[in-house]
Amino acid sequence: MALDGKLVRGEFVAADDADQWCDAEVLRILRRRSLAALRAQVEPVSTAAYARFLPAWQQVGRSATSGVDGLAGVIDQLAGVPIPASAVEPLVFAPRVRDYQPAMLDELLASGEVTWSGAGSISGSDGWIAFHHADTAALTLATPAEIEFTDAHRAIFDVLGSPGESRGAFFFRQLVQGSEEDVKTALWELIWAGWVTGDTFAPVRAMLSGGRKPGTRRPAAPAHRQRRAPRLSRYSVAHPQNRPVDPTVAGRWSALPAAEPDSTVRAHFSAELLLNRHGVLTKGAAANEGVPGGFAMLYKVLSGFEEAGRCQRGYFVESLGGAQFAVASTVDRLRTYLDGVDPERPDYQAVVLAAADPANPYGAALPWPARADADAGHRPGRKAGALVVLVDGELVWFSERGGRSLLNFSTDGEAQRAAAGALAELVSSGRIGGILVEKLDGVPVLEAAAHPDRKVTADALVDAGFARTPRGLRLR
């Protein structure tokens, strides 16, 4: 009967007898009922509690890590997530790595431990960037976007090779067979489409700064990791260059690895990765990730994980349905964020995140809060350049790129003052250049005095140091 799969041998009850047998179908029923009982024991936390939990889970703010090893761990957790290039260092890495320096990222890239890929251009010089651990890059890389290849594109491929068939890393001048400007344009088209990568992040920084070389700041000291001997720069060359290299094409370029074609292998890896990234994996979070096969594919894998005891399915966060998955230890940590569980937690704790940051649950695991006076022309979204300010897990403000338009979601004046203080701290830290608020909820900010609710928001900004200008309220 055991050979036929009708009986299962194991240790099912506490007893001296080592040999215990159970009918296979009865065991399945017991397992299902045990899992159901386990789910019923877990009281769901509020959505605000989850919004407090997620940034801390991703090491934002007080939970920040440090050093190059810490940055490597952050990249492991965020592997494959498209992030606006303009937000990568000041708004995503810096809040997670307390001593972050650009040299740390360049060290990981130069060592080959980490690679980066483009995931689409945005307006101007910005674009979406994803990072990958070298050992698992094939499992987190997206399939490159299809573009119409020109002779310049094909000439680059002739040197670099195609994805999965890289011929090595080459300097820009080794790629040039015609006009340098044409090759530069073609190279960046391949970068944003996800075909080509570089061994330094310097070209992306140069592109974001308009192609200028950083000339006024003293370069940071190399941030070598502990327990590692200093390594030589990969871009040192035996023969000096006679002409300066355009900073937007500096370093060496190579073809990216090919993405893993086996959907089952990718689904299993993605399920583990997303559990680690989100703590509690929900349908909304999975949909925002754009996983091939969607949540339906992940659900099958996660159900298998549950049966194997690798995770739990339950109703962990209220209002998000019963199809939620988490590791048991994660659920225990989530419950420490229950409303009122920690009376010593300071009220009005604010955190500013890039709207597209995976640590922002709104617009992904959680829906954007509704606004009674919603303006069709100003809606929140996980957009490049946009910011969200969360106070005690509640979305208080949504700011468009540069702060031009600010949407308020709170009637709590103290929460808004905390939000304004967090924005002011972001500017004073130098992580962003400045903020100019021109509109509040679609109304010119200089007319806020005529609207009591908007006046509270404007006053909070002024109290935080924003100055009145002919265009609006500015802080820099």
Language-model regions: role of each:
Residues 2-476:
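Long, charged, low-complexity, helical-prone intrinsically disordered regions
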